[in-house]
């Protein structure tokens, strides 16, 4: 009996010590959470999380770095690219992030960055918010755990883009980090409708190429203007083994694409450098094609056509002063006593490319849209079936007929 | 890219005319009628050719579809629940057909049991907007997928025949 009591007392003491140890560890951990910072300081001290970012101002790269706090970015898809994108923007001190994703963290995601094994089973948006808030409590977060392509979620999604920004303003930029065509088309449709600039990003299913594409409705090609662009990866389709797999992924390619995406986001928001409409990445050859993309005047998206018209009208009313986008100042010669003029010696064949830009080297469309005749060969127009649809049958009757088969 | 038999099957499925998605209120009702006519015809064709392989029905709005599909391998019938939503971008993008009970059992699937389609499916769909509908997605997407994946999954012992599902 006495023995038993002694061992219980001993166990009690051990447990108490363990509790104290854990409490100390916890206290130390929560002490590491930094408090919110009201204004970004450029003071170079170890304790200032923004000193190296504000140094961009001192170096003359960015004029107004602290303005980043006024901006809201929506990230659709918080996977291999989206989560890293969110982390970069969080560390940069963005004002607000709105995250959309309907997926859960899985161990199969661990070949990519950001998520940790202990987050398995959590929703990606919930896990992201927890980590990001810890990294930078100054950022405001809003998360939505749903599929934006669903009829009952889409309107809410559009609503948050329109008024989810700081002080109820529209978001400043939408970043597409999704992994499927349907979601890209849904973002495209929404952004054309509400005239919202967005940047598309993607990594190929074989993980060795990627791209970003800036979409300014009416000004640049929208995602429905033409079949998606693909970076030619110099891999013969026939030698690419697809047996037993849907998609491969690498943390490297995804990290690079996220880097491109955030770099251009920062350049756009803080107005430094220039933003390319399209930037590709071919990992096999370390090749980075870039090009400008004009909208298709016959685009299937009716709102794209409206935005194009608006932009043309804007251009007519505000003719661009100088063609050159390069901010380097032109040398002005006040007098020209010899009457020297520059003669454009570009051959006609090359000039054409500017009006109707051919794809940059190393880029191709995912597929061609064939002529109407080719479609007819594939699927014969059956006239009898078209007559059937003319029958005045009610929807309910058809639904019950299908059910009754 | 598409074999002769599939081409013949496709040619017999009525084409659709209305380019309207679930957000286009009145026009969507018209599109939905075309979908139903096309699906009814396709199922009837399948029955006639002794190749009946799925049943579908939808909610009242026609935005959510569900039913059964089956595949006969070595004289045994394997049946699965099939479901999909009509995305807001429909018919610009095809529905993403899912077989939830096979989720995690094959690599040829995306999360939630959405089937992994061939490289040919999306271009083919894109070229035939708005003429292709749900029936075409079944014929070009799910049909060929089952034909490749089910025998493989059975051989590997990942799916086993359930006695109860063999009676029709």
Curated annotation (Swiss-Prot), chain B:
Sorted UniProt keywords: Ubl conjugation pathway
InterPro entries in UniProt: UBQ-conjugating_enzyme/RWD (IPR016135), Ufc1 (IPR014806)
CDD domains, per database record: UBCc_UFC1 (cd11686)
Keyword Transport: no
GO molecular function: UFM1 conjugating enzyme activity; UFM1 transferase activity
Single GO BP term: response to endoplasmic reticulum stress
Residues at the active site: 116
Family named by the database record: Belongs to the ubiquitin-conjugating enzyme family. UFC1 subfamily.
Function, in words: E2-like enzyme which forms an intermediate with UFM1 via a thioester linkage.
Protein name: Ubiquitin-fold modifier-conjugating enzyme 1
The species this protein was found in: Trichoplax adhaerens
């Amino acid at each position: 009996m006495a023995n038993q009591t002694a061992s219980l007392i001993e166990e009690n003491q051990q447990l108490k010590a363990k509790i104290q140890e854990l409490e100390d560890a916890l206290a130390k951990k929560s002490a590491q959470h930094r408090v919110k910072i009201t204004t970004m300081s450029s003071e170079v001290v170890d304790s200032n999380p923004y000193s190296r970012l504000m140094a961009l101002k001192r170096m003359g790269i960015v004029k107004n770095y602290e303005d980043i706090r006024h901006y809201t970015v929506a990230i659709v898809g918080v996977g291999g690219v989206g989560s890293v994108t969110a982390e970069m923007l969080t560390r940069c001190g963005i004002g607000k992030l709105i995250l959309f994703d309907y997926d859960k963290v899985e161990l199969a995601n661990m070949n990519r960055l950001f998520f940790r094994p202990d987050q398995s089973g959590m929703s990606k948006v919930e896990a992201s918010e927890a980590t990001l808030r810890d990294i930078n409590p100054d950022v405001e977060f809003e998360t939505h755990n749903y599929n934006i392509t669903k009829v009952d979620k889409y309107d809410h999604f559009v609503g948050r883009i329109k008024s989810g920004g700081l002080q109820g303003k529209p978001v400043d930029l939408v970043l597409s980090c999704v992994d499927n065509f349907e979601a890209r088309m849904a973002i495209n449709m929404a952004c054309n409708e509400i005239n919202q600039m967005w940047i598309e990003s993607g990594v190929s299913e074989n993980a060795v190429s990627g791209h970003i594409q800036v979409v300014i409705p009416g000004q640049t090609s929208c995602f429905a203007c033409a079949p998606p662009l693909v970076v030619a990866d110099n891999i013969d389709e026939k030698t690419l083994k697809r047996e037993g797999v849907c998609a491969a992924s690498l943390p490297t390619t995804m990290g690079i694409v996220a880097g491109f995406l955030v770099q251009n986001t920062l350049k756009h928001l803080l107005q430094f450098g220039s933003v390319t409409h399209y930037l590709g990445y071919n990992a096999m050859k370390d090749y980075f094609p870039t090009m400008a993309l004009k909208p298709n005047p016959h685009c299937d998206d009716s709102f794209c056509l409206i935005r194009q018209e608006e932009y043309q009208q804007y251009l007519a009313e505000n003719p661009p002063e100088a063609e050159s986008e390069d901010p380097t100042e032109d040398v002005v010669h006040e007098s020209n006593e010899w009457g020297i003029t520059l003669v454009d010696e570009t051959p006609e064949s090359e000039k054409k490319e500017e009006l109707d830009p051919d794809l940059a080297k190393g880029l191709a469309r995912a597929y061609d849209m064939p002529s109407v005749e080719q479609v007819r060969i594939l699927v014969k127009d059956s006239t009898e079936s078209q007559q059937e649809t003319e029958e005045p049958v009610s929807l309910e009757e058809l639904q019950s007929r299908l059910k009754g088969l | 890219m598409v074999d002769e038999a599939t081409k013949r099957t496709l040619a017999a499925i009525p084409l659709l005319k209305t380019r309207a998605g679930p957000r286009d209120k009145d026009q969507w009702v018209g599109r939905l009628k075309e979908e139903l006519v096309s699906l009814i015809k396709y199922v009837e064709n399948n029955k006639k050719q002794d190749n009946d392989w799925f049943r579908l029905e939808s909610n009242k709005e026609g935005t959510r579809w569900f039913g059964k599909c089956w595949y006969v391998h070595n004289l045994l019938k394997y049946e699965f629940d099939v479901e999909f939503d009509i995305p807001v971008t429909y018919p610009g993008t095809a529905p993403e057909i899912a077989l939830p009970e096979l989720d995690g059992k094959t690599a040829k699937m995306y999360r939630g049991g959405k089937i992994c389609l061939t490289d040919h499916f999306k271009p083919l769909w894109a070229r035939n907007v708005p003429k292709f509908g749900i029936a075409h997605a079944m014929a070009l997407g799910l049909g060929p997928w089952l034909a490749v994946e089910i025998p493989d999954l059975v051989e590997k012992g990942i799916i086993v025949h359930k006695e109860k599902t063999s009676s029709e």
